């Protein structure tokens, strides 16, 4: 199901490969719960903030001038593994988003309970659209 506003998620696999933008948008706007209990895999670059670790991408809506970062706050069993990954290094993470965790108060940044993380090569196009 796609929740009306979103394309349906492929249910033929146990893990849904999604863009970080899609995870953020669904967490903020999709009231039908299409991500609830779903294992999701995303690719992004690591951001070590003062009080948190994030996986992020840069989203371009129209042109580079309107580029904005989109990110997931990393929690869960694999959080400690992020110490092995420097800021700006690229990773693939698998886990579940915490329902209703992206709020105006936290800048619409969902919490992502990460089960696994692995280093990957940067994509040929690092942006999301």
For the regions a protein language model found, what residue spans apply to each?
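OB-fold and OB-like single-stranded nucleic-acid-recognition modules
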Residues: 1-129
């Amino acid at each position: 199901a796609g929740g009306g506003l979103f394309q349906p998620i492929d249910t033929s696999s146990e893990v849904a490969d999604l863009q970080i933008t899609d995870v953020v948008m669904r967490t903020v706007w999709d009231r039908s719960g299409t991500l609830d209990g779903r294992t999701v895999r995303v690719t992004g670059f690591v951001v070590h903030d003062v009080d948190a670790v994030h996986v992020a991408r840069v989203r371009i809506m129209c042109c580079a001038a309107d580029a904005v970062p989109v990110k997931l706050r990393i929690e869960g069993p694999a959080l400690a593994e992020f110490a092995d990954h420097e800021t700006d290094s690229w990773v693939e993470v698998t886990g579940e988003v915490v329902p209703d965790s992206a709020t105006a108060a936290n800048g619409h940044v969902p919490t992502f309970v990460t089960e696994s993380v692995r280093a990957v090569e940067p994509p040929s196009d690092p942006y999301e659209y």
